[in-house]
A protein has these predicted regions:
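Active-site neighborhoods and metal-handling regions in enzymes and metal-associated proteins
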Residues: 23-454
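Bacterial N-terminal signal peptides
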Residues: 6-16
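Positively charged n-region of N-terminal signal peptides that target proteins for export
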Residues: 1-4
Length: 454
């Protein structure tokens, strides 16, 4: 046991975390070209992160909420969360110091009409950093839901949106118990005006504002820099390091940086003569094609990246041509899919059209692209699933402008250097759709990373 522990330490370099910076550095511009071994951007201190998070949240509340409520013709939107049981929309509206709902937190947005500002009310015992107006005096009305009913009666909205949905968890935050309590407090007339807040929820969560897109490239660059470290001889010693070693290196690296993964990192190995993807305790060897799937959460935005690396054999100086061509095939499918983004087009249509075009070019694709942003697998229409390349209800919704995406897909190809073995060339890169063009947030991998001699 002791020898195994010591050996695992010797296989992976423990890299010192850079000091936390007290202020944001100049923004990194969006780029179509990905750097092969980028420097790690400065990581903000927790205090500075809170300033950024709260500033963006205030701007989103000021701009996105009026836009989506007026798009949907909803004049009152009500959401509820209970402590440690936050629904996803409410969780995204809490300031940086409000780490969960308190007791029962009820948020109300009301549009008075005629272009007047949206009212933002919190019917709870605790304020939310001045972002919502406290609107409950328990000493006057102890029943919290009756206080909500009184607010609604005073405003007499035509539509009362609450979050329930059969399709998406993002729009299904109202629990049965709380719905029953709310319904009991509301008048029969107002109960009849309840509508689903599903679309409001999706639009709030999927919409990215300019301030977020100014930050996003540095966040994706951070993920790319960490992947570049993982796919290097700093971390990987062929013949010694296992796939699981690299997975746990990622976790330790993020902990040292004060960052969070939103899923456990993946490392897979494809090897000449071996079927499928090897993982876990499999030792990485010369001649292996490595795959990683890695995502972080930072400043309330998420990344999701899949890259490939090749471990040179002794005497080799470059990636075998058949493997290099396989990645180019996946890049071509990325191009086809990006060209098929269109405002209002259902995700299903974008997937089916792209897949058909790729197959017509002689490629063997599987497309499973998803929105990203506030959540890793974000709100909005799916564009295919790895296990379903046909119509899916979750892909029926429209593609909207000002949304971020993980362009996730694969192609399969027979590699001559491996005796015609069928190899899986998985790729995933984060991108932004402005309504006209899909642009990569920090470029995309177009060449397989080379892991050479020490």
């Amino acid at each position: 046991m002791v020898r195994l522990f010591a050996a695992s330490l010797s296989t992976i370099a423990v890299l010192a975390a850079p000091p936390l910076t007290a202020a944001p550095s100049p923004p990194i511009p969006m780029s179509e070209t990905e750097q092969s071994a980028p420097a790690l951007p400065p990581i903000l201190s927790m205090r500075e992160r809170a300033k950024v998070i709260d500033g963006i949240l205030a701007e989103r509340l000021d701009t996105v909420i009026p836009q989506i409520m007026r798009e949907e013709g909803v004049d009152l939107w009500l959401m509820m969360s209970r402590e440690y049981f936050e629904e996803p929309v409410v969780a995204s509206m809490l300031d940086a110091k409000s780490m969960s709902a308190r007791r029962r937190t009820i948020l109300i947005f009301h549009d008075p009409g005629n272009g007047a500002p949206i009212e933002r009310l919190t019917v709870s015992r605790y304020g939310l950093a001045g972002l919502f107006e406290p609107s409950w005096a328990p000493e006057d009305e102890p029943d919290q839901w009756q206080a909500v009913a009184d607010i609604i009666a005073a405003r007499d909205p035509a539509k009362i949106a609450i979050n329930y949905s059969d399709i998406t968890a993002f729009g299904d935050g109202m629990t049965h118990s709380q719905f029953m309590a709310m319904s009991k407090a509301l008048s029969p007339e107002h109960r009849e005006r309840i509508v689903s807040g599903e679309t409001l929820s999706v639009r709030w969560l999927e919409t990215r504002i300019a301030s977020e897109m100014e930050l996003y490239p540095s966040i994706v660059r951070t993920a790319h820099a960490i992947i570049a470290e993982a796919f290097s001889r700093k971390v990987i010693t062929p013949g010694t390091t296992t796939a699981a070693d690299v997975q746990w290196w990622y976790r330790d690296r993020l902990a040292k940086l004060g960052l969070t993964p939103w899923f456990h990192p993946s490392i897979g190995i494809q090897r000449e003569g071996a079927q499928g993807m090897l993982d876990g305790d499999t030792v990485i060897q010369h001649g292996d094609l490595l795959w990683t799937d890695f995502g972080i959460t930072y400043l309330r935005l998420n990344t999701d990246t899949q890259h490939l690396a090749y471990v040179l054999k002794p005497g080799e100086t470059k990636v075998p041509a058949g493997l290099a061509a396989g990645l180019k095939n996946s890049n071509r499918v990325q191009d086809i899919l990006a060209a098929n983004f269109e405002v209002g087009r259902p995700g299903n249509v974008a997937m089916l059209k792209s897949r058909s075009e790729a197959i017509a070019e002689g490629l063997d694709p599987s497309i499973y692209t998803h929105p990203i942003g506030t959540h890793g697998h974000g709100a909005g229409p799916a564009i295919g699933f790895w296990d379903n390349q046909e119509y899916d209800p979750r892909g029926a919704g429209p593609i909207n402008a000002n949304t971020a995406w993980s362009i996730e897909l694969t192609t399969y190809a027979e590699v001559p250097e491996w005796g015609g073995q069928r190899v899986d060339f998985r790729t995933e890169e984060d991108a932004f759709f402005d309504g006209k063009t899909v642009r990569y947030i920090d470029g995309r991998q177009t060449e397989i990373t080379v892991i050479g001699p020490q």
